[in-house]
């Protein structure tokens, strides 16, 4: 289920909203989710960022055209467009920075399997691959070259213990129910079960909340 299907169920009028406004809503949701989740979420695969980038380019062109017109009647419209443009830019920059920070922190983890690599965009994958290569070369020139060859790998799993650092999936997140749904939460001493109503907000371990978010029955807040 993609975000359009989720939003259509939650708000039947969603597709009557202009595409530009829907894209802004989806971008905002993606930004909030990425900043809230302890691990990297999947890159939007519905062409969202291509449309966002096209819209930003169009707004920049419009601002450039209107800047040459000093008619006081157009000044207010120019301010509105510039404000909207800055909002788009802020959301995109903040979203990408949140993702890059996660990639930098756990590069080997996100390069370790095809499923994890699929979460990255093409540019992010190229960045992560190059970043890890540079880091490994730096370690080799600094100290790893003095180690035996079998101890120079950064992804060693000797004795069944992996050297790859992974995100903390047990960290807490806030989620909002998008529909009535049952919730199972694992505790230290016992597990808990609850029935969430639409719009209810609860705090859960990400490991428990993840399946609800991926199924589209809840969103990160």
Swiss-Prot record:
Job description of the protein: The GINS complex plays an essential role in the initiation of DNA replication. Has a role in chromosome segregation.
Cited PANTHER family: DNA REPLICATION COMPLEX GINS PROTEIN SLD5, SLD5 PROTEIN
Keyword Nucleus: yes
Subcellular location: Nucleus
Name under which the protein is recorded: DNA replication complex GINS protein SLD5
Lineage, broadest ranks: Eukaryota, Fungi, Dikarya, Ascomycota, Pezizomycotina
CDD domains, per the entry: GINS_A_Sld5, GINS_B_Sld5
Family: Belongs to the GINS4/SLD5 family.
This protein's record includes keyword Nucleus: yes
Gene it is expressed from: SLD5
Any one GO biological process: chromosome segregation
Assigned keywords, A-Z: Chromosome partition, DNA replication, Nucleus
């Amino acid at each position: 289920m993609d975000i359009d299907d989720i939003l259509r169920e939650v708000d039947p009028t969603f597709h009557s909203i202009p595409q530009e406004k829907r894209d802004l809503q989806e971008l905002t949701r993606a930004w909030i989710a990425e900043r809230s989740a302890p691990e990297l979420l999947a890159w939007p695969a519905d062409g969202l960022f291509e449309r966002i980038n096209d819209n930003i380019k169009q707004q920049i062109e419009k601002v450039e055209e209107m800047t040459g017109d000093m008619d006081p009647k157009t000044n207010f419209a120019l301010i509105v467009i510039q404000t909207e443009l800055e909002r788009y830019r802020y959301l995109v920059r903040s979203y990408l920075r949140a993702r890059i920070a996660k990639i930098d922190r756990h590069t080997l983890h996100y390069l370790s399997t095809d499923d994890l690599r699929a979460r990255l965009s093409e540019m992010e994958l190229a960045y992560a691959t190059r970043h890890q290569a540079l880091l490994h070369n730096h370690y080799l020139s600094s100290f790893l070259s003095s180690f035996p060859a079998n101890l120079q790998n950064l992804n060693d799993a000797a004795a069944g213990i992996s050297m790859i650092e992974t995100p903390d999936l047990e960290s807490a997140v806030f989620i909002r129910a998008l529909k009535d749904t049952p919730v199972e939460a694992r505790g230290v001493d016992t597990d808990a079960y609850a029935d969430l109503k639409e719009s209810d907000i609860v705090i859960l371990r990400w490991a428990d909340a993840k399946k609800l978010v991926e199924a589209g029955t809840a969103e990160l807040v």
